Amino acid sequence: MSRYEASDIEARWQKAWEEAAIFQAKEDHSKPKYYVLEMFPYPSGKLHMGHVRNYTMGDVIARYKLSTGHNVLHPMGFDAFGMPAENAAMASGGHPKDWTYSNIDTMVEQMKPLGLSLDWSRMFATCDPEYYGQQQALFLDFLEKGLVYRKNAVVNWDPVDMTVLANEQVENGRGWRSGALVERRELTQWFFKISDYSDELLEALDGLENWPAKVRLMQENWIGKSRGLQFSFERTDGEEAIEVYTTRPDTLMGASFVGISPDHPIAKKLEAESQEVADFVAECRKGGTTEEAIETAEKLGYDTGLRVKHPLDPNWELPVWIANFILMDYGTGAIFACPAHDQRDFEFATKYNLPIIPVLEPVEGAGELTEAYVPTKAEKVRYVRGFAGDELQTGEEGVNTAVDKAEAEGWGQGVTKFRLRDWGLSRQRYWGCPIPVVHCPDCGVVPEKKENLPIALPYDEDGKAIDFSVPGNPLDRHPSWRNCACPNCGKPAQRETDTMDTFVDSSWYFARFTAPRAETPTDLDAANYWMNVDQYIGGIEHAILHLLYSRFFARAMQICGHLPESAKEPFDALFTQGMVTHAIYENAERKDDNGRAIYHYPSEVEERDGGVFVKETGERIKVIPSAKMSKSKNNVVDPLAIISTYGADTARWFVLSDSPPERDVEWTASGAEAAYKHLNRVWNLCDRIGEMDPDAKGEGDEELLREMHKAIRDVTLGVESFGFNAAIAKLYGFTNTLSKSKASAAVQKQAIKTLAQLMSPMTPHLAEDIWAHQGGEGLIANAAWPVADESMLVEDSVTLPIQVNGKRRGEITVAKDLDKAEVEKLALAHEAVQRVLEGAAPKKVIVVPGRIVNVVA
């Protein structure tokens, strides 16, 4: 019997696929098209098991669709711009471009052994000038259509590194790299007008039936449509009133103070007049700028001394506070605070000893408030200081009646607002797509001409290497790149040195794959043929920003003529896979020099004597339950090591078999070993059947064929519904049946070839080898998917339970169409029934065809 040599088999069939170019997609209008896409990776230089699981899922779908007669597009590329490359250049003195392309080469070499059915001829990286040049063309088209604009915006500014920081780069108010106190600085930034599409993006979610409900809900909440009241508080000093927007006008009678953002015009005026206010506002500008960062920061306030009049009682005056938790870019930058029913306001009022006035309470009554009472708008509550509607009503009813009252009395207006803000795309970074505009002293901001694209990044400073360790954006200090002629008047001008947010790069790549070498952003004919993406696969962490931005981009590209109307929703179906996890191995006997835990790689430990120990030192290990694979915890498994030991098919089989794909899967050495043993078993089964006399007769042909067609039915259903683990469970069962079968050689040969076809999306190399050994025609990757014979799925026999006086005594298997009288005879002849009857005749026998036999003794 030959040995299952995974490495030889896999290399041989990968070469065969490449030579046959069977995965290179070409337009073919005689077939239905199918576009499957996994979210493309960042080129970190290291493939991990999460990648393996993600790409294997997509590969199963792609191979299945190819075998069912579809023309499949299954491309791969790299999301290659971003900070890690600049950070690597800072650390090593290298160049982001060299680091990135080296990592891409490495990752391609790591991916290819997996045997993925990818069209590598379409590969690109977003840092390719050919790609980002077309992205610059899109920017210019968007600018022409009014979808891009400039405005001042508050950003996180690192005064040492002299750059804008993303919120996640601000740690405890300091820059993550420099350690400098971060400032909230106002800079001129470029924005996409995504907020113009808030309603459309929200309404269209209902049509995304093949997206997970939780993703649609996350996007709905992010877009954040709300109906509220906009009104003004008159100032007691007679100056301009303070306009506020609230989604809970029903709590207005619990107003304690009016809060304004540190960036509100009133705050800015006071800042210019008072050093004390200026110092306070400067303190507020330390830390992040997102809602999340502000929400978790300590609540800070400053009493301006200004007072306003309550709109329902001119004798009721409220203080005006500057508060660090109020955002200028939501609503009006001013709020009225009701501490009794907003936790943020409650914490602020408690800290500064401001009134807390309950307006509503649970229907059953309330005790002393120790935190804000914040019921949902759907809950019915008791209004104890209401001013509109009934005493008992839902919050939503209270809001609506409050808005109606304000409008009727003329002091407020019902307004619908969205949480979704315009998308700021400016980044003060080198390693990104340059924004294609020029600043001219005479003409102002001028779009670059398309014939001058791409505006490529300079590799060096006119022959001198760029020093990435110097703070700031290298493009700002470049001796020549920044200088150019104005596209409008031809006079000396300067290029924009900001680059685009890397989310821009990933917001249209799916469209570029349809014609990756086109000299325009898309080829409309190719886009018409291939779009939409039929199946998109990726992590839940991209549920909001990437997917929302892509939906916006598809609409903008359609407006500009780069996509058809039908592609406004670019992803027909979305699947979000779970993570690959692994146990964490913490050294139980010592810490590092800084007192921190020491974690060991799985390859460094061994199980023995009822415990887990470090192989080299024998130190005891504390095993922490499975968690997401993480370099910081060393609980990572190298896919290449697994492929080297067991083969790619084993890795593919295991990540698909052990858990439903939407859930996490725990990687274990024993699980991988079990998967490998099973594939060996299938290989040996193929060998055994191949050695049979082709004319050998047997018994049980029909039974084996029936099980084969059941397997076809069940595996097909599993693959089509993303139930890969269920499909594999059926394949285990069918393998067991075949290994025990005594059917004829011809039927067993048919069964093993069918087994190979059913396994081919999951274990394509092994399947190809079995197919070839059993005389299959051509490549199994090109073979038509087997179709279950419905007549073979109809059972000829049925097993009926027998009950005597209501108690189950046994069962009989009979022909499905057997006469009732014959069924009764067989039931009464059953040994267990005879023991109960003790020779007496039964009082009654009831035969329910196909279900049960009831005997009354």
UniProtKB/Swiss-Prot annotation:
Disulfide bonds: none annotated. One of its GO terms (biological process) is leucyl-tRNA aminoacylation. InterPro entries: aa-tRNA-synth_I_CS (IPR001412), aa-tRNA-synth_Ia (IPR002300), Leu-tRNA-ligase (IPR002302), Leu_tRNA-synth_edit (IPR025709), M/V/L/I-tRNA-synth_anticd-bd (IPR013155), Methionyl/Leucyl_tRNA_Synth (IPR015413), Rossmann-like_a/b/a_fold (IPR014729), tRNAsynth_Ia_anticodon-bd (IPR009080). It is an enzyme of class 6 (ligase). One of its GO terms (molecular function) is aminoacyl-tRNA deacylase activity. Its EC number is 6.1.1.4. It catalyses: tRNA(Leu) + L-leucine + ATP = L-leucyl-tRNA(Leu) + AMP + diphosphate. A motif ('KMSKS' region) lies at residues 628-632. Coiled coil: none annotated. It holds the Pfam family tRNA-synt_1. A motif ('HIGH' region) lies at residues 41-51. ATP binds at residue 631. GO terms for cellular component: cytosol. It is found in: Cytoplasm. Keywords: Aminoacyl-tRNA synthetase, ATP-binding, Cytoplasm, Ligase, Nucleotide-binding, Protein biosynthesis. CDD domains: Anticodon_Ia_Leu_BEm, LeuRS_core. Belongs to the class-I aminoacyl-tRNA synthetase family. This is Leucine--tRNA ligase.
